[in-house]
Swiss-Prot record:
NADP(+) binds at residues 41, 166. Its EC number is 1.-.-.-. SUPFAM superfamilies: NAD(P)-binding Rossmann-fold domains. Keywords: NADP, Oxidoreductase. The keyword Transmembrane does not apply. It is an enzyme of class 1 (oxidoreductase). Pfam families: Epimerase. GO terms for molecular function: oxidoreductase activity, acting on the CH-OH group of donors, NAD or NADP as acceptor. Induction: Expression is under the control of the azaphilone cluster-specific transcription factor azaR. This is Ketoreductase azaE. Pathway: Secondary metabolite biosynthesis. Coiled coil: none annotated.
Length: 338
């Protein structure tokens, strides 16, 4: 498809992954309209881009993505929209009601966006959905190897269990998206990017480490010495990817005609608390006194499930960053605010 100054709507524009997708798309020459929940967030995001001199980004406000017709006004306000990247979906542990605070925004937000595009944006040819490895893995009954042909399963009742809610939200949202394509036959096709835990440099607009994205907490807390004497939470799901590689995958998914209707399991490797600490030790030796001793055993479980990322490599042309590079760059970005 190519960029050629095409216009992209990027939902959840201030999120961790979305912020890096925004940079990737702007660098490739796209015009990008991001959705934010408030004007303050939109202005803050644009101000963070001001030092790059980039004028190809703008924003629209969508306050509550779970509301009926939440995206209608935003979609109608954008002329000649070509492509959509949907990242907006909860990923945090600060919620009280699984349905209202987590499941509805993920599921209704996705289905509602697709309905709005069909109704008001006939020029859109493709939607790329930021899904998750949560839609691929099925704990605790893991096969030896996961790939894009694997589908996670969960019931609505199980989704009410806090430890399952996030995984369920991604499974139901992805399912709703593909069901919409099959049943409503819109003017656009769908591609999903399914990363595991996403690490990497913090977004430019984040100036407080307390506001850091949830997935980077393990790096932040290790860097700050929180786990020097042990006690770090189990490093589930034990697989990771660099956010910059995820951003590249989204751009490729927008541009390659042959990926229509496909899922991509964008996983770089396995990680553990031990491996995170050793990556910090290798890239920032000045922080060694904050880290657990180097002789602490690796906490990656024996016999952990494998993964096959060959489709992402071959079709999307991905070359994944290694853990030391990812963690080292993340720490460097965090030290600017620490």
């Amino acid at each position: 498809m190519g960029s050629l100054a095409k216009k992209v709507l990027l939902t959840g524009g201030t999120g961790f992954i979305a912020s890096h997708i925004l940079t990737e798309l702007l660098d490739a020459g796209y015009q990008v309209v991001v959705t934010v929940r408030t004007h303050d967030k939109g202005r803050q995001l644009l101000e963070s881009l001001s030092n790059t001199g980039d004028k190809a980004a703008s924003y629209v406000v969508v306050e509550d993505i779970a509301k009926d017709g939440a995206y209608d006004e935003a979609i109608q306000s954008i002329s000649d929209l070509d492509l959509v990247v949907h990242t907006a979906s909860p990923y945090h542990f600060n919620y009280t009601d699984p349905k209202t605070d987590f499941l509805d925004p993920a599921i209704k937000g996705t289905a509602g966006l697709l309905a709005s595009i069909k109704a008001y944006a006939p020029t859109v040819k493709r939607v790329v959905l930021t899904s998750s490895s949560a839609t691929i893995v099925t704990p605790p009954n893991h096969p030896e190897v996961y790939d894009e042909t694997s589908y996670g399963s969960v019931t609505w009742e199980e989704a009410m269990v806090p430890q399952v809610t996030y995984r369920a939200s991604k499974i139901f949202a992805e399912r709703a998206a593909f069901d919409f394509i099959e049943n409503d036959k819109p003017n656009f096709d769908l591609v999903t990017i399914n990363p595991p835990l996403v690490f990497g440099p913090k977004p430019r607009h984040v100036t407080d480490l307390k506001a850091l994205n949830t997935s980077n907490h393990i790096i932040r807390d290790t860097m700050l010495g929180k786990w020097k004497d042990g006690g770090a939470p189990i490093a589930i799901p034990f697989t990771w990817v660099d956010v910059r590689d995820v951003a590249f995958a989204h751009r490729q998914a927008l541009e390659l005609p042959e990926v229509s209707g496909q899922r991509f399991f964008t996983v770089a490797g396995h990680f553990s608390n031990k491996r995170i600490a050793e990556a910090i030790r290798a890239t920032h030796p000045e922080l060694a006194d904050r880290l657990p001793p180097s002789d602490v055993p690796d906490d990656l479980p024996e016999g952990i499930y494998g993964f096959d990322n060959s489709k992402s490599r071959k079709v999307l042309g991905m070359t994944f960053r290694d853990l030391n590079t990812c963690v080292g760059d993340a720490v460097t970005s965090m030290l600017e605010q620490a």
